């Protein structure tokens, strides 16, 4: 069975500095009915605000592709438009792997500190009348040269500079403007499969191909760029079920647009991997977690780290209704990202990470016009 659920978003009118918190919803790709975790993870949560309780919908109703409607926060009433989700290859059953051994709390604490330092908030502003929404999401520095891993549905906005879309990289608590950035890789497969997502109020997807790389290109103020950025390395091997992890993001579902701009703080969660899934074959492609404060709009592009200080996953999907401790959060694995990048480019991702960012930015800039055309064709 293929299960498609919506990208998370907080959308407001551009006149009010609109923000749509872009974040893909929970998608477990499997042949059997989707199993949605209802119990909270065994976690210690450090939320940045009180999470309100809202009614949890029946998430197990569908036995076929699901089209759940995302109710974004808008100045105008939300619509019920949906977008065709990417069609992955036939999905297989959950992958069976051994349960990982316990690790020390000290190691988890150290990894949490590293992950939090590497966490960024990404905000892109779309002009009024542009036909698409402003967004707020998360990202993680994975290289000290200033390379950020995030989602493709966030990074696509960096293709729209010639349409007066501006993006800024923020960090800190609360998050403040720090850097400008430019894209250095967005999977064409995601753009082709999600060409209409840009203009949809309630798009949905699976999380497949939903990763991208952007690189810091300038400072947001007059301060010089640092010689090195705090970062966490991209893991090579996938984790196992039961592995303790740390999840970090700039969740913003319960904040008004003005609060996102002025009072957005990180959410850090200690938990464990509940299940693992594959998109196509017996590879560990998707990590599933129980509910937590990280399961909310704005967490898209956030990071999942293990106790060894490695980034093992990037948040892509989640359910978004009900108390956060009853939701389901998923991430694509670092090993999936590595494999998919190699499949699309014929090269290891480490080659891209190893070259100067100025070269990566220049090389990718040559492709921006053709990639932009894919996602803006419906506007012309």
What are these regions (language model features)?
Residues 1-36:
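Sec-dependent N-terminal signal peptides
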Residues 39-144, 151-152, 209-212, 356-380:
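N-terminal activation segment of mature serine protease catalytic domains
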Residues 164, 171, 175, 180-192, ...:
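C-terminal cap/linker of serine protease catalytic domains
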């Amino acid at each position: 069975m293929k299960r498609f659920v919506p990208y998370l978003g907080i959308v407001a009118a551009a006149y009010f500095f609109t923000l749509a918190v872009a974040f893909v919803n929970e998608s477990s790709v499997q042949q059997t009915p989707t199993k949605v975790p209802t119990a909270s993870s065994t976690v210690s949560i450090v939320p940045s605000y009180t999470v309100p309780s809202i009614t949890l919908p029946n998430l197990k109703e569908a036995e076929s592709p699901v089209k759940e409607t995302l109710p974004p926060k808008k100045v105008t009433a939300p619509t019920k438009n949906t977008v065709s989700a990417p069609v992955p290859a036939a999905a297989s059953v959950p992958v069976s792997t051994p349960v990982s051994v316990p690790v020390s709390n000290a190691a988890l604490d150290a990894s949490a500190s590293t992950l939090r330092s590497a966490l960024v908030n990404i905000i892109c502003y779309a002009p009024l009348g542009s036909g698409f929404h402003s967004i707020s999401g998360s990202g993680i520095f994975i290289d000290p040269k200033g390379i950020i891993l995030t989602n493709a549905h966030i990074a696509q906005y960096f293709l729209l500079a010639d349409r007066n879309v501006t993006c800024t990289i923020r960090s800190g608590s609360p998050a403040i403007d720090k850097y400008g950035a430019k894209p250095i890789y967005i999977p064409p497969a995601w753009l082709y499969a999600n060409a209409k997502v840009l203009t949809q109020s309630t798009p949905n997807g699976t999380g497949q191909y939903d990763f991208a790389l952007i690189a810091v290109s300038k400072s947001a103020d007059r301060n010089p760029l640092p010689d090195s950025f705090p970062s966490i390395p991209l893991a090579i091997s996938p984790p196992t079920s039961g592995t303790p992890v740390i999840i970090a993001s700039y969740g913003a579902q319960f904040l008004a647009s003005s609060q996102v701009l002025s009072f957005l703080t990180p959410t850090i969660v200690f938990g464990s991997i509940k299940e693992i899934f594959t998109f196509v074959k017996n590879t560990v492609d998707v990590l599933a977690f129980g509910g937590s404060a990280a399961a909310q709009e704005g967490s898209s592009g956030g990071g999942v780290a293990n106790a060894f200080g490695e980034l093992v996953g990037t948040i892509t999907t989640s359910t978004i209704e009900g108390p956060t401790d009853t939701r389901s959060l998923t991430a694509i694995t670092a090993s999936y990202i590595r494999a998919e990048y190699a499949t699309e480019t014929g090269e290891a991702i480490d080659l891209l990470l190893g070259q100067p960012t100025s070269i990566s930015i220049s090389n990718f800039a040559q492709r921006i016009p053709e990639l932009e055309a894919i996602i803006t064709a419906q506007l012309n």
